[in-house]
Structure formats: structure tokens, C-alpha cells
């Protein structure tokens, strides 16, 4: 069980950028969900923040998050477990995707690169994930079909 946290601020000039301090405070509040490490991503303009607290189960040495695409334009955080990830990983490697980790979460990133939001059709398991796609300027939030790993979100003024 990991903890994930994401914020997308409006492009309004009246809103100040997200600070690393703010993200770290949020992660401290959910640290009990993942005491084995934490990581953050903040977009250059400070309007997107992704945070992750990690409970290491698979890819213990190399599974830090957020994970990013090779071109650093797609960023993802995941709480969950993907079934049959070794087969999917092999298929993605055959298509030319390079893996930086040995964990199962990275398959979701490469499936998103390959299929976009249709990546969910290829994922089996219990999970909640958040993707920031700089190319599309899109924040994508999803969970497993049965809500085993629930996700809570809030929209304000939009």
C-alpha cells in the first residue's frame, strides 16, 4: 500500500506555484501508507505536483516514484499491484520500450505511452494511478475496475 498525491492548479495568474514544501507536508500526512521512501515531481511552471510515498514490495531497490518517460514529458505515480506484469513487460520491451526499474509500476507508464488512456484495457490488478502528460497538458486519474485501490479527488471551480 503506497500513498499518492496530485495537484493541478489553474493557469490563473492569481494562483501561486506549488512549493516543494507544500508537497512534502502532504506526503508527511500520508507517510503511514508508504514508509519506505518518497518522491515528488513538480512541473517547471509549478502548476502540477505529483507525490508518492512508497511501500516497497516489488522492485525494492529500483522502484522509486514518480516515474517518467524517456523524454521526461509523461510522469506517473502508482499505488497498486499489476498481475502478469512480467509478460506485459516482455511485450513492451519487444516493442522497444526501455525499463529503468524492476518493479511492476513501470509497465503502466509504457502502456500509457503506447495506448494512451486505453492502457487501462491492458492492465489487470488492483491499482490507482495518476498521469501528467505534458504533451497533451492532461492530468489522467484512474483506478482498478473494482475500486480495490480507491482514489479520492476534488474539483474546485472547474
Task: Tell what function each PLM region has.
Residues 1-158:
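N-terminus-centric sequence/structural signature that marks the extreme N-terminus
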Amino acid at each position: 500500500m503506497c500513498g499518492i498525491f496530485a495537484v493541478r492548479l489553474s493557469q490563473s495568474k492569481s494562483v501561486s506555484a506549488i512549493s516543494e514544501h507544500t508537497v512534502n507536508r502532504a506526503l508527511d500526512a500520508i507517510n503511514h501508507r508508504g514508509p519506505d521512501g518518497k518522491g515528488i515531481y513538480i512541473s517547471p511552471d509549478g502548476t502540477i505536483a505529483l507525490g508518492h510515498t512508497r511501500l516497497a514490495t516489488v522492485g525494492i531497490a529500483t522502484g522509486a516514484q514518480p516515474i517518467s518517460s524517456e523524454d521526461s514529458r509523461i510522469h506517473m505515480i502508482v499505488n497498486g499491484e499489476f498481475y502478469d506484469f512480467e509478460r506485459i513487460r516482455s511485450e513492451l520491451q519487444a516493442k522497444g520500450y526501455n525499463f529503468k526499474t524492476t518493479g511492476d509500476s513501470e509497465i503502466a507508464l509504457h502502456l500509457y505511452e503506447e495506448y494512451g488512456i486505453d492502457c487501462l484495457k491492458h492492465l489487470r490488478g488492483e491499482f490507482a494511478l495518476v498521469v501528467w502528460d505534458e504533451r497533451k497538458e492532461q492530468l489522467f486519474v484512474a483506478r482498478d475496475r473494482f475500486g480495490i485501490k480507491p482514489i479520492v479527488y476534488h474539483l474546485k471551480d472547474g
